[in-house]
Amino acid sequence: MAAKALLLLAAASHAFITPVRRLRPMQPLRAVPLDAIELTTHTLAANSALTSTADELAGSLFGASLLPWLAMLYWLKHPKTQAPKGVCFGLTYLLAFVFGSIPAAIGAGALYGASLADADWLHGAAESLLAATNCVVVLGFRDALAGKDDPDRLRTAATYWAGFAILSCFVVVAGNLMTMDAAAHAPWLNGVGNLDNVNEPINALSIPTWIIHTSSLVEWLVAMGLAWRYADVIGRKEWKGVTWGMLPLHTSGIVACCYHLFYNAPELSWCVALQAGCTCLGNTTMAFAMYRLAVASGWTLSDGRSDAEALYARLTQGVEAEAAETETPSLVTAAPSSTTASLLGWEDLGDAWALDSDAFFLGKLLALSAFLAYLVKYTPPLIPGSIVDGWAGAGDGVHSGAAALVIVVPTLLNCAKWYQRSQEGAEFVGDI
């Protein structure tokens, strides 16, 4: 119950405030008709009700998503599964993001009465823990495919990154106290890389925060591809099921980016509930995939009972469980499929850059993520004002429809790619 309560608090990170655009040059004042004022009042009331409903639903779904994730970790880390230790640590490290988001969300609400999504410096720091998780998972798979397993260096790097994320928040707080200036929208890492004189809503994500989001999407796709490749290399097809299990979580990331792309618009508050739903579904599919993997590796219900009894004894009597020795699966020679050799998708970057050092590999991912961040952040401000005005008056239905396309199209393409890749001898002729 305590863990669920904490996750319900984390759902506060998905509350919304209305985006406020920066002031434009002085324009002649116009009289506003009374019926327009009445319509605006009704719209705001409807958006507020939708936001409250979405928040409540998201809180329940986020809370429900913890149990399947813990179940997934149990089967993943079971000695019989013989999963790469770096991957085990990476997926466990995700809990740092989950519980790191809680104080960030509470801080945004307590300090500014805003959502975490609208407090960039807290938002970026918290989300960076998710990006770090994905990096560790990718590096864990790279190590396993290279025939080595060194989780200690990954633990050290992840610990340093967590410290950096916390330090970045303290730097903003210290600067705040010195200037006595409220910083609800203070950019994370001082907005390094932001372009000046660009007309954006005040709650637009900074470049560093956008890079964190785009890198998370790219890294997760790369991890999906590496899991698929790992299945071929060790001759265990159940790892391909893990790739399928990861797919809803990638869609969850797309939903989050879509919401930020539209500047956290109140009429798109359904994105928060959808993101929570995709997270809960993804955690469940991941748990099922790991269950299949564990069963194929020899896990039985009697193992589960023994582990439960050992855990109970450890909690009540302080009895330490005996450490079970694990063996690293032997690598087998497997001819990559034609889709893998063609290197057509983001997920194939792991194979394309397999010979790079970790530093060079991550540097390439960072450069790619930065390019995508600039693209999504600064393309909307380039749209002519007449089109922007027309869009503003198009109505909530049009806005929701456009957001739905941003979410559904890449998700369907992702599903199509993995479906065609799973067909024997099939060759995918597209990209995401």
Regions found by a protein language model. Name each.
Residues 21-432:
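N-terminal plastid-targeting presequences
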Residues 10-12:
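Long, compositionally biased alpha-helical segments
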